[in-house]
């Protein structure tokens, strides 16, 4: 059976279904930042002490994390550039989220999982993301997330961003936006919607 990890951001649970994730979100949302693993993993192939075997990741998406601690507009510009130069020409519709903090998350989903040998999954995702970062000049594409690839944790949509400085909720929620909204709206409008939506 497959499971997804839950974190705050430290990994504290293995969720076998949406209901288990929702229980964690109900417990921690508004108190801690809520994260889930990008990929699901096979619980029949755990490592020693029940640790996750990241080589069992089911590769059904490619995940992008755009971050800039000083200017989130740079992230928006990178996301727009990638949509215009990569997604639109290939007729790809990504899922895009304003994280509520200083960046965006994007997923490009596959029609079916990519079947790669277990020992090359991490390297394949990492090298592909590095290639895209260079080719499309994605300066805000997070190198730490690229290097972690299959073991990355992503902010859970519809959860409140908690300030790392104050430990308090900011009133800004991780919110999904359409490609059209991302291409047309300014950063202030996007943040305003991320506050209103929830």
Language-model-detected regions and their locations in the chain:
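Long, well-ordered alpha-helical scaffolding segments within enzyme catalytic domains
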Residues: 74-92, 120-137
């Amino acid at each position: 059976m497959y499971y997804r990890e839950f974190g705050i951001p430290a990994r504290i649970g293995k969720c076998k279904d949406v209901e288990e994730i929702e229980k964690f979100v109900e417990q921690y949302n508004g108190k801690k930042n809520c994260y889930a693993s990008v990929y699901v993993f096979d619980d029949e192939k755990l490592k020693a002490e029940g640790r996750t075997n990241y080589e069992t990741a089911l590769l059904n998406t490619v995940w992008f994390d755009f971050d800039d601690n000083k200017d989130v507009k740079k992230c928006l510009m990178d996301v727009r550039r990638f949509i215009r130069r990569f997604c639109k020409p290939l007729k790809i519709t990504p899922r895009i989220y304003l994280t509520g903090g200083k960046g965006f998350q994007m997923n490009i989903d596959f029609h079916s999982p990519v079947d790669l040998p277990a020992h090359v999954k991490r390297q394949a995702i990492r090298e592909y993301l590095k290639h895209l970062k260079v080719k499309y000049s994605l300066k805000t594409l997070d190198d730490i997330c690229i290097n972690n690839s299959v073991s990355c944790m992503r902010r859970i949509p519809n959860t409140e961003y908690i300030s790392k400085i104050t430990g308090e909720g900011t009133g800004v929620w991780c919110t999904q936006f359409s490609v059209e909204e991302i291409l047309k709206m300014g950063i202030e409008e996007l943040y305003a919607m991320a506050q209103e939506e929830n």
